[in-house]
Amino acid sequence: MELPTHLAGLKQNFKGEITTEEADIEHYSRDASIFQIAPQAITFPKDIADVQSLVKFVSEQKTDQPGISLTPRGGGTDMTGGSINDSIIIDMTKYLNVISNLTDGNVTTEPGVMFRDLEVKLLARNKIMPAYPVSKAWV
């Protein structure tokens, strides 16, 4: 499925993947809530520059397309519809899932890291994350 004309500029300066395939639209139109909202496109940024490119694109389009928006998504486990929208979804889990800088008191994660993966690394050092995210699946 082709990108809608008004979203064609998304491909510019974007190294990641963009999909508008019907099966993907169906999958990303739901989360753990009772709601269903079909997005126009789903993006999979490869790095922070891709995320910046998406934000810049949407910001530049706001005048002509006031309804355009970005919704970041992890596991889609939100129970309030917070990970679905009718515009552009940014799936952080495919490429932005690195755990780094694991020291005695700190850890740095990218937004797509699953909690279970972080927990394994922390427990190997006899550490825990004292507060769980709302969804234990994602950090």
What is each stretch, according to the model?
Residues H27, D78-T80, F115-D117, W138-V139:
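Flexible loop/turn segments at secondary-structure boundaries
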Residues T80-D86, E119-K121:
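Short acidic, glycine/serine/threonine-rich loops at helix termini
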Residues L10, I34-P66, M92-V134:
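N-terminal glycine-rich flavin-associated loop
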Residues M1-A32, F57-L70, G75:
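N-terminal accessory segments
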Residues A23, R73-G74, N106, A131-V139:
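Core alpha/beta catalytic barrel or barrel-like domain that forms the active/cofactor pocket
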Residues A23, R30-S33, Q40, G82-I84, ...:
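Short capping/connector residues at structural and topological boundaries
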Residues D78-T80, I89-M92:
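Short, acidic (Asp/Glu-rich) active-site segment that either coordinates a divalent metal cofactor
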